């Protein structure tokens, strides 16, 4: 990964936090976004910028210049509607690389049909490590 890589991570639960911290430890410039201000506050010292916002609002994303990121990771785990809307917003804004978390095969199919090329499925990742 080039030193100047700029990543946006949406959804700072356990999974999103681990992704953000791993990227930051490799020298990436990491910007985190979550609708929960406590989560943003908890990670702010470990990333370049932590913002509390509603990622389903494309205007809010534009104010944060998300379209200038090299890649975005949507790690929202419990609200698939928010995942879909955030992914669509990022695709519409022209973010070059959009990586989205899914919770199973049905969600993968939906995300693929929307044009998402990189889909993470934590459960499958764990299963492949164990087997």
State where each predicted segment sits.
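Cytosolic regulatory regions of ion transport systems
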Residues: 1-131
């Amino acid at each position: 990964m080039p030193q100047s890589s700029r990543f946006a991570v949406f959804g700072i639960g356990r999974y999103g936090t681990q992704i953000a911290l791993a990227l930051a430890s490799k020298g990436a410039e990491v910007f985190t976004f979550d609708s929960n201000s406590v989560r943003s506050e908890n990670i702010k010292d470990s990333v370049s910028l932590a913002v509390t916002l509603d990622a389903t609002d494309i205007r809010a994303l534009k104010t944060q210049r998300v379209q200038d990121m090299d890649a975005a990771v949507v790690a929202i785990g419990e609200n698939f509607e928010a995942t879909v809307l955030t992914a669509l917003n990022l695709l519409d804004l022209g973010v070059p690389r959009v990586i989205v978390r899914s919770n199973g095969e049905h969600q993968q199919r939906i995300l693929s049909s929307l044009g998402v090329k990189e889909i993470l499925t934590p459960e499958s990742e764990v299963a492949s490590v164990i087997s």
